[in-house]
């Protein structure tokens, strides 16, 4: 979502995501892992104020970010792929925890790419190509809502948006490294999920809670809890009465799924 706020600035909303399903199918020859997942945006969001300038990149953030952050990479890859020469000023108000598996960095990058695409009239197909160069989850965030995601994350099939659900989140304050979590996987862990992602999507649409519980899966959850057994204490008191409780992404956040309005954050539709 883009809102013009005057003086050449625009305010962007950057939503978090959940992995309602996430499995790793194997390791590819290029070093990436082949995944399959059901992704869903939720109402937890960061806010970015952006302004195009003559030259340079300027970022003011409410939390510390690395110098090679995803917002800067989005700006660099956009310029490289389009040949457009311009600078960018960004103010980021962060609400999505860093290292939580909620996709905040990828969502920030996608919000900037979507805005630049509107300004410079770049087609979505070209933006998707740029997004894949910025990060594996970035293409999904150009769509948002509900999607089946494959490949290393760059193959996105938009699905009918799931509505009528909400979640509570548990963040144990641990920064979970995506790279380390993938390195912790062994071939025996691949393809262990039910694999019926389309069926899980239908179960959400049909409010089949029993099937949702049966088909939900995250390959990283067991690995994460083995690395951080202390998290179990907090999880015992989290998500009472929920439909399902599970980890998102490569951690460290967990979500508890409820019917609409019972959780703090609602499912958000896509573009």
UniProtKB/Swiss-Prot annotation:
Catalysed reactions, as listed in the record: 4-CDP-2-C-methyl-D-erythritol + ATP = 4-CDP-2-C-methyl-D-erythritol 2-phosphate + ADP + H(+)
SUPFAM superfamilies: GHMP Kinase, C-terminal domain, Ribosomal protein S5 domain 2-like
Pathway: Isoprenoid biosynthesis; isopentenyl diphosphate biosynthesis via DXP pathway; isopentenyl diphosphate from 1-deoxy-D-xylulose 5-phosphate: step 3/6
Source superkingdom: Bacteria
Active-site residues annotated for this sequence: 17, 137
EC number per UniProt: 2.7.1.148
Residues where ATP binds: 97-107
Gene3D superfamilies hit by this protein: 3.30.230.10, GHMP kinase, C-terminal domain (3.30.70.890)
Pfam families: GHMP_kinases_N
One GO-annotated biological process of the protein: isopentenyl diphosphate biosynthetic process, methylerythritol 4-phosphate pathway
Family matches, as InterPro entries: GHMP_kinase_C_sf (IPR036554), GHMP_kinase_N_dom (IPR006204), IspE (IPR004424), Ribosomal_Su5_D2-typ_SF (IPR020568), Ribsml_uS5_D2-typ_fold_subgr (IPR014721)
MF terms (GO), sorted A to Z: 4-(cytidine 5'-diphospho)-2-C-methyl-D-erythritol kinase activity; ATP binding
Keyword Manganese: no
Protein keywords: ATP-binding, Isoprene biosynthesis, Kinase, Nucleotide-binding, Transferase
Listed PANTHER family: 4-DIPHOSPHOCYTIDYL-2-C-METHYL-D-ERYTHRITOL KINASE, CHLOROPLASTIC
Family: Belongs to the GHMP kinase family. IspE subfamily.
Function: Catalyzes the phosphorylation of the position 2 hydroxy group of 4-diphosphocytidyl-2C-methyl-D-erythritol.
Name of the protein described by the UniProt record: 4-diphosphocytidyl-2-C-methyl-D-erythritol kinase
Organism this protein belongs to: Thermotoga sp. (strain RQ2)
